[in-house]
């Protein structure tokens, strides 16, 4: 987004995925059997993002013709890297889907994207986007707004790193999440 049109700010935070990673490994076969897809950190982040957007409607909004438009639906754009470049299909009503339904939907959209079979309807109407570059080995990045959306979440790779817990050093699975948002909606 043009900075002069949409002044944007990015803020990052380190998130501990250790408990999730343990849960994921323990229940991987169950998820595969029930949903046809292994559960990944991206699925958890998409579910959490959808719920947070319901609680913070200023981020589930857009600027249309110079006016703020707060959306009633939470439709997540999910960035997918294909040979031809980046596409951002939409998971509709993500706030009403279970983690398994989101996992299955994203995987179906990814297959369609890689086979160049996404329909225009599957590419339009996102109210907020999520971009995960962790699979490419990226630790953190500044995601770019997709106007008229007012927010996008960037996800870096999960790394096992040493951290203090009291007087002990323990291994933790950490990733950096970066939120880029339009400053006109948040403290602007």
Identify the role of each PLM range:
Residues 1-188:
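C-terminal catalytic/motor cores of large multi-domain enzyme assemblies
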